[in-house]
Amino acid sequence: MTTTRFEPLQDGPTPLFLDTSGLFAYFHPRADEHEETKAFFDRIVTGSTPYRPLYTNTYVVDELVTLLQSKATPSIAWEAFERIVESGAIELVYENESRFDAVGDALERYDDHGISFTDHMIAVTMRELNVDHVLAYDGDFETLGLTVVPR
């Protein structure tokens, strides 16, 4: 399976934020993108692609677990929660008041785009952490000026 669509646009270590849609594709065995996302994560684990560090946030974990409970099984949802929270490879970012306020500003600025609160929170967090690449199967991040992986 080719993963060239996942290669970073820069050389060297590239921080990557993990969106709900990317994690859903990885954890749900019947997701359309499951095999390519699994192959991509295998390359991260072996170090053959330079994405590091990996980030996600509590809003993504909430969305992911809720989605997996309804679209997969409670046991898959629990496995995803446990693997993300216990992972030494993924930094779980907890939200704060300043990010929450910044999301309010972003919602107002992009009010005609229908971008979700969670996606705005991801973008605000990514900018704060100087992360440009996001693993997502969601076009909203391009609207927000971020680099979506896979391309």
Give the positions of each predicted feature.
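Short, well-structured N-terminal submotif of metal-dependent ribonuclease cores
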Residues: M1-T56, Q69-E79
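Helix-adjacent hinge/juxtasegments
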Residues: V65-V93
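Short acidic-hydrophobic, aromatic-tinged amphipathic segments that line or gate anion-handling sites
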Residues: E91-E95, V149-R151
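Acidic, PIN/NYN-like endoribonuclease modules and their adjacent C-terminal/linker elements
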Residues: M1-Q10, A123, L129-R151
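Active-site neighborhoods of divalent-metal-dependent phosphate/nucleic-acid chemistry enzymes
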Residues: V93-D132
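Short active-site oxyanion
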Residues: P50-P53, A89-E91, N130-D132
